[in-house]
């Protein structure tokens, strides 16, 4: 029992570091003492996110060890509440927004083989004749995340604005497009990188300003652009950002073997075998003194 408590505390400290960043921290303190059985060590943790030292205590979800297998070295079970709280603090911290200069926007379209030379694109920046315009994407409200057997479902309102600069330094909006997007995502981890794949999506336009009947083609263009460019580009950027974050905390030092990320109704399961880095093994053995 002493060894199990030391090991649980050691893993807890390392795990908390991996999923914390700047003003966003996570409280994964034990909810009860670890349990040792004939086949495994089991520990239960809170999983409460802390933003700017303010924590939102949530009711602990029901968990049963029967939800896990017994053929892998390590299992992590996450309630969907943990992922939903992560989306909340990411929104509060202003991380769910993107700004692209006009040239960057055109380059993104080209990257995804979406012809950036169509006549409709100059019309989007029609008021920006002397200075380059900008495109901004942000969430006006916080996204929600749920776990289902088909994948992790992310629902979010999204606003896209095309801006052009004034001489006074302020920006004016030429076009605004608002919609609700629901995506179903599968995740995997390989070669020390996180990969996200889109298995399903739904788009519900809510508002399109400055668009009369003569410019209805702009709305159609934007809807097509979002499905063929917008969603894949955001997922690609999330892959890079999340991989960079977790590897900056040392996750890439572990030899993670055949990891699986499995979504089920109400929870997310990570199962894997792994090799312990020598320097962390030394740290752990020293902590036994």
From Swiss-Prot:
Catalysed reactions, as listed in the record: cholesteryl (9Z-octadecenoate)(in) = cholesteryl (9Z-octadecenoate)(out); 1,2,3-tri-(9Z-octadecenoyl)-glycerol(in) = 1,2,3-tri-(9Z-octadecenoyl)-glycerol(out); cholesteryl (9Z,12Z)-octadecadienoate(in) = cholesteryl (9Z,12Z)-octadecadienoate(out)
Tissue expression as described in the entry: Expressed in adipose tissue, heart, and skeletal muscle and to a lower extent in stomach, testis, spleen, and liver.
Sites carrying sugar chains: 53
Domain of life, source organism: Eukaryota
Disulfide bonds listed in the record: none
Compartment list: Secreted
Induction text: Up-regulated by cholesterol-rich diet.
Keyword Glycoprotein: yes
Keywords in alphabetical order: Cholesterol metabolism, Glycoprotein, Lipid metabolism, Lipid transport, Secreted, Steroid metabolism, Sterol metabolism, Transport
Record-level Gene Ontology MF annotations: cholesterol binding; cholesterol transfer activity; phosphatidylcholine binding; phospholipid transporter activity; triglyceride binding
Coiled coil: none
GO CC, alphabetical: extracellular space; high-density lipoprotein particle
GO BP annotations listed: cholesterol homeostasis; cholesterol metabolic process; cholesterol transport; high-density lipoprotein particle remodeling; low-density lipoprotein particle remodeling; phosphatidylcholine metabolic process; phospholipid homeostasis; reverse cholesterol transport
Task performed by this protein: Involved in the transfer of neutral lipids, including cholesteryl ester and triglyceride, among lipoprotein particles. Allows the net movement of cholesteryl ester from high density lipoproteins/HDL to triglyceride-rich very low density lipoproteins/VLDL, and the equimolar transport of triglyceride from VLDL to HDL. Regulates the reverse cholesterol transport, by which excess cholesterol is removed from peripheral tissues and returned to the liver for elimination.
Protein family membership: Belongs to the BPI/LBP/Plunc superfamily. BPI/LBP family.
PANTHER family registered for this protein in UniProt: CHOLESTERYL ESTER TRANSFER PROTEIN (PTHR47616:SF1)
Protein name: Cholesteryl ester transfer protein
Classification lineage: Eukaryota, Metazoa, Chordata, Craniata, Vertebrata
